[in-house]
């Protein structure tokens, strides 16, 4: 069998209510797989790359075709198994089991290196699934906008008395994840300077309204920042260039941003971070001809970038890693104090995780934006008193352009996910929305990831690297009846540095779906509360007790035991 990773084909998910598979439970993963490769969604769809360096939706185009065929023929009591983007088996299960089970990029720990993975990838034996690329629930840059927004808002609360008006953020990377940063900063009230080395990515963000304008030079960018901050306007500015050159230059000039982070694809030095002085074309060529030399050159450039971030940190500028493992890469080439500035999770997000709050998302399979607007209204109706959340939904409707099938991201926790899912299912049943809705989340969630340099950095009990938790999350979601469940390795921070799981559940308006939703959308966020309660976080222990969790080794929950 040939193993083509390139095909000149534009893929788009079907819209409307006509099925191309045998039920909505198999139509949903089919549409979401296709949606991941929509040219308006994916970063490089003709090569099956969705986002995050080489995060793919299928191993090769032959595997993609086979997955599509399998999903179209899948019966309501069968389960498709996908191994690193390749469909490997269809098995008889039962109607409440997942229709698809996915395992991507998983390697035995001793061999879990980029070097070994790249050898397997070259042989057609593996696929890097990132987080939502290989699990078919990527929704474009919107998927991380609210998390980035919440991070910036919390940083403003901690460092600037709750307001980012007249402030500016320095960052880099405008890919599928990093592309959320300029809009998130704007929504949080700040200006931003966003460095990106590929003009095509800047064009994509300008077209989708994630970035407001592009500067012609560093001097031009700084002049715009000075003007807009003085006026109290929140405008995002893109600058085409290499962060490893521009960020140190800003330090040299004595420029002082109000916040510094980075979201380049530093997790993958072979494909995701342009070495200083190289063109993108040269980078791609050398990645093939001299991979080890290319990796070293990329890491040395990251070291310069991180040293500049450390300089800002030492000036007292709030500086944080936004989860791309750039500190680790710099440390590996001699920046011994790379971890002096924190990651964003321990600095700003962990209290949310303790309550099971994370990136809940849903997609209208109809393709009709009105279905999303109706669900927005339903969220406001159910969560009546959360004005911060209402403000987010209003801003999202006004500012966020849908990419592919209409979708919404909304950070909610254990208290609300089940209620929202059941309400959405009822909207499908009653015809209030025109077709079923799928509910999923990022793997970046409170109970679904072990990543010592990101989500589980600096855990109170030192359990940063314990990866039993995402495995238990995947097993529980499978037992609870999620429509598809995924278990990945290496997302966000690269091979050897993370394990994580995902789930998606379909709201098709049936009683059977309601029962599955009730189980999945309680149990999934509950694993996050459990994980943090087990680590000794008081917020999580209180949440577990309040929400009726039965955690045998957490005394505060024993009143919930039957």
Curated annotation (Swiss-Prot):
Aminoacyl-tRNA synthetase among keywords: no
Keyword annotations of the record: Cytoplasm, Histidine metabolism, Lyase, NAD
Keyword NAD included in the entry's annotation: yes
Active site: 410
Residue positions binding NAD(+): 52-53, 130, 176-178, 196, 201, 242-243, 263-267, 273-274, 322, 492
Alphabetical list of PROSITE patterns matching this protein: UROCANASE (PS01233)
Top-level enzyme category: lyase
Cofactor: NAD(+)
Signal peptide: none
GO terms for biological process, alphabetical: L-histidine catabolic process to glutamate and formamide; L-histidine catabolic process to glutamate and formate
Catalysed reactions, as listed in the record: 4-imidazolone-5-propanoate = trans-urocanate + H2O
Stored HAMAP family: HutU
Described purpose of this protein according to its UniProt entry: Catalyzes the conversion of urocanate to 4-imidazolone-5-propionate.
Record-given protein name: Urocanate hydratase
Native source species: Klebsiella pneumoniae subsp. pneumoniae (strain ATCC 700721 / MGH 78578)
């Amino acid at each position: 069998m040939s193993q083509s990773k390139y095909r000149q084909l534009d893929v788009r998910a079907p819209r409307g209510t006509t099925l191309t598979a045998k039920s909505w439970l198999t139509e949903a993963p089919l549409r979401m797989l296709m949606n991941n490769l929509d040219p308006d969604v994916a970063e490089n769809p003709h090569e099956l790359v969705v986002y995050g360096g080489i995060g793919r939706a299928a191993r090769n185009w032959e595997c993609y075709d086979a997955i599509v065929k399998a999903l179209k023929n899948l019966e309501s009591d069968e389960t498709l198994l996908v191994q690193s983007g390749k469909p490997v088996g269809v098995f008889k299960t039962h109607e409440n089991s997942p229709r698809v089970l996915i395992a991507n990029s998983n390697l035995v720990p001793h061999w879990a290196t980029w070097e070994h993975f790249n050898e397997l990838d070259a042989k057609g034996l593996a696929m890097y699934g990132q987080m939502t690329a290989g699990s078919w629930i990527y929704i474009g840059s919107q998927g991380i906008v609210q998390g980035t927004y919440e991070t910036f808002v919390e940083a403003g609360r901690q460092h600037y008395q709750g307001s980012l008006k007249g402030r500016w953020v320095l960052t880099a990377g405008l890919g599928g994840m990093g592309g959320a940063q300029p809009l998130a900063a704007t929504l949080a009230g700040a200006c931003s300077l966003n460095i990106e080395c590929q003009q095509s990515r800047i064009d994509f963000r300008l077209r989708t309204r994630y970035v407001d304008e592009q500067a012609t030079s560093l001097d031009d960018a700084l002049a715009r920042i000075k003007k807009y901050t003085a006026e109290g306007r929140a405008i995002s500015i893109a600058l085409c260039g290499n962060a490893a050159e521009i960020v140190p230059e800003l330090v040299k000039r004595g420029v002082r941003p109000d916040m510094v982070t980075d979201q380049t694809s530093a997790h993958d030095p072979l494909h995701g971070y342009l070495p200083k002085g190289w063109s993108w074309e040269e980078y791609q060529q050398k990645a093939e001809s001299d991979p080890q030399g290319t990796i070293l050159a990329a890491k040395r450039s990251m070291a310069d970038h991180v040293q500049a971030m450390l300089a800002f940190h030492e000036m007292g500028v709030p500086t944080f890693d936004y989860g791309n493992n750039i500190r680790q890469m710099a440390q590996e080439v001699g920046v011994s104090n790379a971890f002096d500035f924190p990651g964003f999770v321990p600095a700003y997000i962990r209290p949310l995780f303790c309550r099971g709050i994370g990136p809940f998302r849903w997609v209208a399979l109809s393709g009709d934006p009105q279905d999303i607007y109706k669900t927005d209204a339903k969220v406001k109706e159910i969560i009546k008193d959360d004005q911060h959340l209402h403000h987010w939904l209003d801003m999202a409707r006004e500012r966020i352009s849908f990419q592919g099938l209409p979708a919404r991201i909304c950070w909610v926790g254990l208290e609300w996910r089940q209620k929202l899912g059941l309400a959405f299912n009822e909207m499908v049943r009653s015809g209030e929305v025109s077709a079923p809705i799928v509910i999923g989340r990022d793997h970046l969630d409170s109970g679904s990831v072990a990543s010592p340099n990101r989500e589980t950095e600096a855990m109170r009990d030192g359990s940063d690297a314990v990866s039993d938790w995402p495995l238990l999350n995947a097993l529980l979601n499978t037992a609870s009846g999620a429509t598809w469940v995924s278990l990945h390795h290496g997302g966000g921070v690269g091979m050897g540095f993370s394990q994580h799981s995902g789930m998606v559940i379909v709201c098709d308006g049936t009683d059977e779906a309601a029962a599955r939703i009730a189980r999945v959308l309680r149990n999934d966020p509950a694993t996050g509360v459990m994980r943090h309660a087990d680590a000794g976080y008081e917020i999580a222990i209180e949440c577990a007790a309040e929400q009726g969790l039965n955690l045998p080794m957490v005394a505060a929950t024993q009143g919930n035991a039957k």
